[in-house]
């Protein structure tokens, strides 16, 4: 590992953020710290992850939602101090890494099938 990668790993460890495992197709709720004047509040942004970029400290992901009939996409830096928390609401079953095709779809064709836990995981959960 070179020096830059080592420094990035140390910085990620120092930030001490708990980021859940999520993938494209998952529905997530991103809590964002918003500063308005002298007030600071937390705003929830819920949508489908359409892209994920894994670059160590520079990692990011794009979340798409439909707001009052209009598609809205927002790109977040994974380790940004503006992100208060990330919560995975629903797992999506997709076969692509980038779901940009959802931009051209609306209604039922834009739905993503839910990924159900496999039978092996269910057996392990009941045994424990």
From Swiss-Prot:
InterPro entries: Ribosomal_bL19 (IPR001857), Ribosomal_bL19_CS (IPR018257), Ribosomal_bL19_sf (IPR038657), Translation_prot_SH3-like_sf (IPR008991). GO terms for cellular component: cytosolic large ribosomal subunit. It comes from the Bacteria. GO terms for biological process: translation. SUPFAM superfamilies: Translation proteins SH3-like domain. The keyword Ribonucleoprotein applies. One of its GO terms (molecular function) is structural constituent of ribosome. It comes from Paracidovorax citrulli (strain AAC00-1) (Acidovorax citrulli). This is Large ribosomal subunit protein bL19. Gene3D superfamilies: 2.30.30.790. This protein is located at the 30S-50S ribosomal subunit interface and may play a role in the structure and function of the aminoacyl-tRNA binding site. Belongs to the bacterial ribosomal protein bL19 family. Keywords: Ribonucleoprotein, Ribosomal protein. The gene is rplS.
